Regions:
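Non-heme di-metal
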Residues: 1-160
Length: 160
């Protein structure tokens, strides 16, 4: 893949990642509806995923000035596949076909997936503001992992 093709794919990949974050936020919103006693937990995660989508959108706007091309190791199709998985999980939640433990396990899988991390590792930037946004995304995702891990450890029959 030449440099021009990489630069062409970068805005597409960022848009897909933004859509992926919005899909995750919607999934967590479904979980909040499905598990009302845990709604606060899920709604907090959903709001934070919406913030991630905003940050990724901001990265897209900064693209022309400060981001270099993503490496050829990353495929927009990988993001699309992952987003399809998230949509399937939302459909399952709407059918009320899962337990709280299954929702937490799915969330853990989503939060620990390498899709976002690998992408951002390939975005060297000359702009300190963009670098801060990428660092904040990494930090926030790590927080989500800790929150979900804590909920998984707490989650026993009759507790959350």
């Amino acid at each position: 893949m030449n440099e021009h093709q990489q630069e062409t794919h970068l805005p597409i990949a960022l848009a897909l990642l933004r859509d992926n974050e919005l899909a995750i936020a919607a999934l967590y919103g479904e979980y909040a509806l499905l598990f009302p006693t845990q709604a606060s937990f899920w709604l907090t995660l959903a709001e934070e995923e919406q913030q991630h989508a905003t940050w990724i959108g901001d990265l897209g706007h900064a693209l022309n000035d400060s981001l270099t091309a993503a490496g050829p190791r990353f495929s927009p199709a990988a993001i699309e596949t992952f987003t399809r998985y998230v949509h399937e999980q939302s459909a399952l939640a709407r059918r009320k076909g899962l337990s709280s433990m299954a929702a937490l396990t799915t969330s853990y899988y989503i939060e620990t997936a390498l899709i976002e991390r690998r992408f951002f590792e390939q975005l060297p930037t000359r702009d300190p503001a963009v670098a801060r946004v990428m660092t904040e995304l990494k930090r926030s995702t790590a927080q989500h992992v800790r929150k979900v891990e804590g909920a998984l450890h707490q989650s026993r029959p009759g507790s959350f």
